[in-house]
Structures are given as C-alpha cells and as structure tokens.
Amino acid sequence: MKIELLGYLMMWGLVLGTARSTPLEVATVPWNSGEVRLNEIQLVGTHNSYHLEPEETLKTKFIEKSPLSRQYIKTLEYNHLPLNEQFDRGIRQIELDVFADPVGGRYAKPRGATANTQISARMNEPGLKVFHLQDVDFRSTCPTFLGCLQTVKRWSDANPNHLPILILVEAKDSQIPRWVEKALSFEFTQPIPFDEAQLDTIDLEIRSIFPEHQLITPDTVRGDAATLNQAVRTQGWPRLSTSRGKIMFALDNEGKIRDRYTRGYPSLAGRVMFVSAPPGSDEAAFFKRNNPFDRSISHLVSQGYLVRTRADADTREARSNNTKRRDAAFASGAQFVSTDYPVANPALSDYAVAFPGNVAARCNPFNTGGCPFDLPRDIAIR
C-alpha cells in the first residue's frame, strides 16, 4: 500500500504487465520429476494477470487534466491474454487484485467509462471484483473473482497433469486521497475495507469453485507437524507427483490485512491462503520479496521456504531493455519469478522473461533438491 500511495503522488496507484503472444515449447522430462518437491523448481508467473489497458480517450483525458500523470499512464499500457491462454503458454503463477462488493454493482458504472466502454453484466452481481484501480484502470479479462476462478478450474480440469498453479490474491481497499480527486476534478468510488468478514469471503469464493482435493492449503502442507513453519522446515513441501493438477493460493498483502486474515487461525489452520508472514513465525511458509537483489531470498530458499520475486516493475526494464533485475531474479532461487513480459513487447524492446528454450519450468538454480546435477537446469517440466 505504501508503494501505491507513492504512485498517487504522480496520479494514482501501482501497475505492470503485458501479454504473451507466442506458443511455449515444452520438451519431454528425461528424469523422474515425481521425486522433486515444489520448492525445488522455478517457474515464471505474471503480475496483474487480468489486466487490459485503459482506453485511449480516458488516458488522454487525464493527461490533459494533469500533465504530470503522463509518466504514470505509461505504466498502464499493457495487456494480458485471458488466464487460460496464459496457462497454455506455460504460466504457472498469476496474480488477481480483488475489491469487496458484497451487495453488487459498486463498480458497475466506472466514472471514467466512455460511451464505447463495455462493462460486464457480472459487475452487478454480489461478490469480489477483479481490476486494478476503480474508475480509471478497471478493464479486466475476468472482472469477477468467481469468473477468474472458474476459468482456472476449467483449464485445470482439462489439463489434470499440470504443475501446481500459484494464485496470488491482493485485497485492495486503499482510499484515494481527496487532494488527488481535487487535482484531477474527478471523484473516485471509494473501496470497502477488507475486515474479517470480507477476508472470509475470499476463502468462501475459492472453496465454492475448488474442492479440497484440488487445493494445496496450509493444512495439507502442515500435516501432523506442530506448526506450518515446522512442517516446511522439516517435512518439506509436497512432491510434484502428488501436486499435479492442484491450485494453491497466497495472500499478497502484508501488515494489517495479513494480520487480520491470520487472527484466530494459528498456523493458518482452516485457511485457504498462505501468507507472507515474518520468518520463523508459526505461519511462515511463503514469502513475497519483490526486490530480486534482496539477499534474504537465497537464505529463505535454503531453509525450505517458497519465495516469489519480480523480474521487472513499472515497464522500466522493458523500455530500457535492461536484464539485470531479471537475471538477478532467476539466480536468486525464488521459485516464482513474476513479470510483465513473458514475451517481448516489440514496441518497446526485446526484453522478455523466459527460461532458455521457453520451457515451462526448470530445476531451481539455488536449491536443486531432487533435481539431478548432471542435467541442464532448463529441462522442461510439464
């Protein structure tokens, strides 16, 4: 949320992304991947995986009102393919931003919409909505959380041997400062806070789509261990042989929203999502480390934790064709490397984030575990 507030100083929030447009080549696995554990591989994911850029007329409108917003507008200029098409091309980690809408219709008439804007009728239904920023950056390939989950479920059922898919969920409720509204002569729809009841809604909507046997939850990972942290440090993560065809969720938020989600659920017992908890705490299993240069990543990976990092941010790397951050992300050992550019945007540069040979996954370069040392690290895993 602090990053978003910095973004509001320019205009509004935080954003990234682009679309993949070419098929992913997947080779045959020449080794028994069933013995490999989930934390011993590395995959590429996408950030704001639902995103479609704002219409040109809306971008022009805000640039005219606030010329300083031009630079921020550039960070909104990306599009993602529908989730099922991303999965077809090898993406195994996505992120969905959700807004609470228990009555329905709160975001059905975006104030930045034009006469040509198409709004899904599902925006009038009660339930969580998926988009980036109310009234401005609201276009989405799956505007409701349930709709996104149904897309994931259909694809997973049709491809039951797929590697586990991690879905990051960010609960968004930041208020737009009044001074920003005045500067833009634009009144924003203020979001509903994510209290305990609204956080429970996330779990309820997930469980309404996915049966327990299709989920990797804190309970399944903890097993008989005293705490979730103890389980991942001693027993380890599930093997791929028992994890294929399954989905796991993690809460992107830290701070107050994370604490609200974990309160009353020691070691996340009964919860669906993992959280980025303090190292060593009972709930510690997954960590969000956006900065791939963060030296704590390799330390966390060596202790058995899952880590997600980012290869790029705010379109900077693609515009400058700078691969330093991407290369650091790959080398860090983080199991999930998130990008806005799983393929290059030729209008910007050749910058892209993919493994050699465009394989779907590879042995973790830091924590090899069950991956053999005598095979290339970029071998493909279906």
Residue locations for each model-derived region?
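Catalytic cores of phosphodiester-bond hydrolases, prominently lipid phosphodiesterases
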Residues: 22-382
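Sec/Tat signal peptide C-region and signal peptidase I cleavage site
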Residues: 18-20
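Bacterial N-terminal signal peptides
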Residues: 7-15
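Bacterial N-terminal signal peptides that target proteins for export
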Residues: 1-6
